[in-house]
């Protein structure tokens, strides 16, 4: 079950005049965002060379050392480390345990680069400590928590408030050398339609905060129009998530059913061709949300042999690299 974080209300009241000014200012910046930014989306390397990080949620049945060793042996660039409630590193223990996790990673040649968090509020002390600790250890990108649209507030009003919230978070990120990435997630989350993120991210400088584009969730929500969403959000993409799905009946209801890569509805040939066309080559987080004996849900004890989990991880990684190479 997806958990959403209820956001604190902005203490500063918005007059209708100020709201209109903020909205127009955010929208007015959209055509310029990203294209002239020196940090825009591109890692300086060959277009055929990608960095693939394994989402550590799927290895939470392992110690830090075993997690790092297995990830290195499977051929990943590194880990997208879960630093959140029920993650590999709990936020309240981040100062003690994140250095331990990083030490284990570095012992096997894995750089600290990506992490997944519940961070959303630059003024929250625990969240600040998470970012400060990560910045000191060399992380560069993190996924934020998710936002929702409260019923008691209009969506445009929420977008304006969240735009200011992200602008404040970006200021903190800048001092720490971190890039915050908001993931589009299917359902009633902010960002599910993709288009609704434009005024929110458009209120920022698009340097130290942006989008973590998730093609699986984009296709669930966008169907055959997902390309338009990608085209609109592309100036803001700072990292991406890779996974696959198909529609199926579950207990009599049609629902998205997660699958291994290449066995679902995501058109990876077209998707990767567009990423190359748009010159988007950012860190990739590989997720495996289909049945892996509980590893898909972040279980600390799994019901299948760990070698079967590793086998599927290597299979998805091989598919991903081959599909990227073949895309034109």
Model region roles, listed by residue range:
Residues 2-51, 62-72, 135, 194-209, ...:
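Histidine-acidic metal/acid-base catalytic patches
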Residues 23-32, 66-68, 104, 120-211, ...:
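Active-site acidic/histidine proton-transfer and metal-coordination neighborhood
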Residues 50-56, 79-81, 112-117, 142-144, ...:
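Hydrophobic faces of well-ordered beta-strands that scaffold small-molecule active sites
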Residues 55-59, 82-86, 117-120, 147-149, ...:
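Active-site beta-loop-alpha junctions enriched in small/polar residues
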Residues 67-84, 137-138:
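Catalytic domains of carbohydrate-active enzymes, especially glycoside hydrolases
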Residues 82-100:
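Glycine-rich, proline-tolerant flexible connector loops at the mouths of alpha/beta enzymes
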Residues 86-90, 150-154, 221, 294-295:
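A short acidic, helix-capping loop that chelates divalent metal ions and anchors anionic groups
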Residues 94-99, 128-129, 158-166, 194-196, ...:
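Charged helix-capping and loop-helix junction motifs
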């Amino acid at each position: 079950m997806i958990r959403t974080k209820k956001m604190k209300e902005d203490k500063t009241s918005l007059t209708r005049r100020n709201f209109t000014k903020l909205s127009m200012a955010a929208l007015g910046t959209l055509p310029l965002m990203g294209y002239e930014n020196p940090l825009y989306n591109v890692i300086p390397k060959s277009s055929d060379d990608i960095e693939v990080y394994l989402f550590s949620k799927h290895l939470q049945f392992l110690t830090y050392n075993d997690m790092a060793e297995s990830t290195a042996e499977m051929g990943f660039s590194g880990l997208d480390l879960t630093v959140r409630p029920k993650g590999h590193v709990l936020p309240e223990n981040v100062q003690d345990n994140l250095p331990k996790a990083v030490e284990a990673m570095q012992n096997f040649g894995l750089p600290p680069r990506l992490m997944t968090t519940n961070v959303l509020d630059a003024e929250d002390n625990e969240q600040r400590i998470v970012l400060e600790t990560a910045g000191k250890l060399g992380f560069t990108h993190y996924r934020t928590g998710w936002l929702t649209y409260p019923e008691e507030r209009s969506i445009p009003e929420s977008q304006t408030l969240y735009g200011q919230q992200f602008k404040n978070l970006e200021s903190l990120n800048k001092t720490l050398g971190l890039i915050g990435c908001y993931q589009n997630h299917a359902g009633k989350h902010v960002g599910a339609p993709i288009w609704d993120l434009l005024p929110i991210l458009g209120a920022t400088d698009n340097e130290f905060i942006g989008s973590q584009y998730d093609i699986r969730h984009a296709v669930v929500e966008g169907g055959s129009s997902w390309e338009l969403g990608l085209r609109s959000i592309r100036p803001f993409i700072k990292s991406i998530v890779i996974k696959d799905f198909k529609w199926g009946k579950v207990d009599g209801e049609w629902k998205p059913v997660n699958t291994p890569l290449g066995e679902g509805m995501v058109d990876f040939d077209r998707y990767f061709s567009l990423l190359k066309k748009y010159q988007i080559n950012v860190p990739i987080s590989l997720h495996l949300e289909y049945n892996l004996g509980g590893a898909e849900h972040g279980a600390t004890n799994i019901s299948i042999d760990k070698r079967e989990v590793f086998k599927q991880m290597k299979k998805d990684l091989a598919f991903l690299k081959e599909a990227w190479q073949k895309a034109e």
